[in-house]
Amino acid sequence: MIVLSFCGLGFAQNVIEPELQNALNQKGDEMISVNIILKSQMDSEKLRACAEKTTDKHVRRNIMIDELKLFSEKEQQEIMSILHAEAKSNRVADIKGHWMANYINCTTTRDVIYLLAQHPDVMMIGYNQEKYLLWDEKAEPVEMSRDIVIENVTMVNADDVWAMGYTGDGVLVAVIDTGVNYNHVDVADHLWDGGPQFPHHGYNIIDNTNDPMDVLGHGTHCAGTICGDGTSGIITGMAPDATLMCIRVLDDYGYGYASDFNTGMEFAVEHQADIISMSLGLMSASVSDKTLLRNACVNTLQLGVVAAVAVGNDGQMAMVPVPNNVRVPGSCPPPWLHPDQEVNPGALSCVVAVGAIDYYENMYENGSKGPVTWTDTPFNDYPYNPNIGLIRPDICAPGVGIKSLDHDNNDGYNLKTGTSMATPCVAGVMAL
């Protein structure tokens, strides 16, 4: 039996996020999915030092991943013991430890949550809530002549780079999204080879299967902007010879969990992706979601990976004003600080936040706007005052009226608009 003192319960309430406490009040004894974030995080300098003697980037990354896994396994040991003991009484299920951000995701009861909140290793416990993580970027049919390079490719001069011999060949880009129609002929011949374990060129995190097929269309459209090679007649990709890894973290309707973002990033990094593209994000994210995703983005950068991430299409939404208008993880810091940011510096992460422009270089009116702040989190940096905070976005790319791959037609195309469409443009340019 779990016994809580009144003193302990008071302490627990400081660790349990308000969103989770509200859910506990409503759900009573019902099991609930939570993220248990530990206080300890791997020191970045120590992480880099463990692999400083090797120059091979893959060997270096594998050494650092092993260190992160050892660190998290050790730090999570006591909490894991409690969880597995409670699982024998059916009070805990679906236990999963994460090494990228040192937290544990599980489904458990209110009493176990209160018990864990008193443990000295626990920083916070958050509600791992399913949320809609896309925007209403409607697909429109497109009829156009074949044997062309589309406008957004030429607008950023990607075709000029191809003429210099750079087409993305040898660069592995992971699309973390609704999955990808890997049968589309414009990407089918340059997909990641996952061997017999991952025969469909990636992973489906949301369903825990090895088939990341896209049934919604968002991820396929994004993938085409990265590396659609024009086999069916229209070159849509910035880097037409880049290799594509397909990671599905959203369900058939665009819903998902912050914990699955992290799992998708872990998969991409562990399987040697060079670049990540994420055209999704959490609106009004909780402190726990912001914390675990920023921790993941910090370590992703340490492991030598950068990510193009959409800022969102919430620029006209009064319910999420600046400095909370940019979605997470698009609000995470960049890999490099712009000189204009030096008046208000902070720590770095892997995120290159992407906004959208039209073909006349006008800002997309619905694009989310910065600056943002992290003073409401354990990071406590980038304090916000008007026109200060953390500058978001970092860069803008064509995102209005973008033609790319249709998930319902293996040789078809369609048109979409939004920062989701601008983000893979940046990821593709990174690959070049």
List the predicted regions and their residue ranges:
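Protease zymogen maturation seam
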Residues: 115-172, 185-186, 361-365, 370
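Bacterial Sec-dependent N-terminal signal peptides
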Residues: 1-15
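Inhibitory N-terminal propeptides of secreted protease zymogens
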Residues: 13-137
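Subtilisin-like serine protease catalytic core
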Residues: 13, 24, 28-29, 160-201, ...
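Active-site-proximal beta-strand/loop segments in catalytic clefts of secreted hydrolases
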Residues: 36-41, 108-109, 127-130, 174-179, ...
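Extracellular S/T/G-rich loop segment that most often corresponds to the catalytic His/Ser-adjacent loop
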Residues: 197, 327-431
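Short acidic, glycine-rich surface-loop motifs adjacent to enzyme active sites
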Residues: 265-288, 310-311
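Catalytic-core regions built around general acid/base machinery
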Residues: 289-304
